[in-house]
Amino acid sequence: MPPKARAGAAVKKVRRKERKNVAHGQAHIKSTFNNTIVSVTDPTGAVISWASAGQVGFKGSRKSTPFAAQLAAEAAARRAMEHGMRKVDVFVKGPGSGRETAIRSLQAVGLEVGQISDVTPQPHNGCRPPKRRRV
């Protein structure tokens, strides 16, 4: 017999994940110096699945490795393929080390990669960059 809800206790509604049928979409890879985030969206930009190096289980400096980017891209692609995704256009942003690895792992999982675009923002002499590291 299930436990009874206490009087005055808040009832938590759980939203069911609806299964979307999207055959073609976009993969946005944001690769920074510290982390890699992969979002798979439908053509309008609504996120279907996402994963990051931190979400896959890496912490600290290991999040910035190409291997962490590979696992993050695989996780996001698998979840997108459950929703019927077959083909993606890839948009890469940022200077990180996981850019190419993430694209390769999207192909390895079984997604057909169409066009690859670099959408890294370029400043027209905007903010002053951080000082050079002296190691």
Curated annotation (Swiss-Prot):
Keywords: Ribonucleoprotein, Ribosomal protein, RNA-binding, rRNA-binding. Signal peptide: none annotated. GO terms for cellular component: ribonucleoprotein complex; ribosome. GO terms for molecular function: rRNA binding; structural constituent of ribosome. It comes from the Bacteria. Residues 1-22 are annotated as: Disordered. The keyword RNA-binding applies. Located on the platform of the 30S subunit, it bridges several disparate RNA helices of the 16S rRNA. Forms part of the Shine-Dalgarno cleft in the 70S ribosome. Belongs to the universal ribosomal protein uS11 family. Part of the 30S ribosomal subunit. Interacts with proteins S7 and S18. Binds to IF-3. This is Small ribosomal subunit protein uS11. It comes from Salinispora tropica (strain ATCC BAA-916 / DSM 44818 / JCM 13857 / NBRC 105044 / CNB-440). The lineage of its organism: Bacteria, Bacillati, Actinomycetota, Actinomycetes, Micromonosporales. The gene is rpsK.
